[in-house]
From Swiss-Prot:
Pfam families assigned: PSI_8 (PF00796)
UniProt similarity note: Belongs to the PsaI family.
PANTHER family: PHOTOSYSTEM I REACTION CENTER SUBUNIT VIII, PTHR35775
Gene Ontology annotations for the cellular component aspect, listed alphabetically: chloroplast thylakoid membrane; photosystem I
UniProt entry tagged with the keyword Plastid: yes
Protein name: Photosystem I reaction center subunit VIII
Subcellular location field: Plastid, Chloroplast thylakoid membrane
Membrane topology summary: Single-pass membrane protein
Annotated organism of origin: Piper cenocladum
Keywords for this protein: Chloroplast, Membrane, Photosynthesis, Photosystem I, Plastid, Thylakoid, Transmembrane, Transmembrane helix
Length: 36
């Protein structure tokens, strides 16, 4: 049962967390270097 419920929790979590981390690091990178 854990094997079936774990991917269904992990997949949306990774799908939401990874882009959020990428966006945050990108915005921090841009703010630090003042590219804009």
């Amino acid at each position: 049962m854990t094997d079936f419920s774990l991917p269904s929790i992990l997949v949306p979590l990774v799908g939401l967390v990874l882009p959020a981390i990428a966006m945050a690091s990108l915005s921090l990178h841009v703010q630090k270097n003042k590219i804009v």
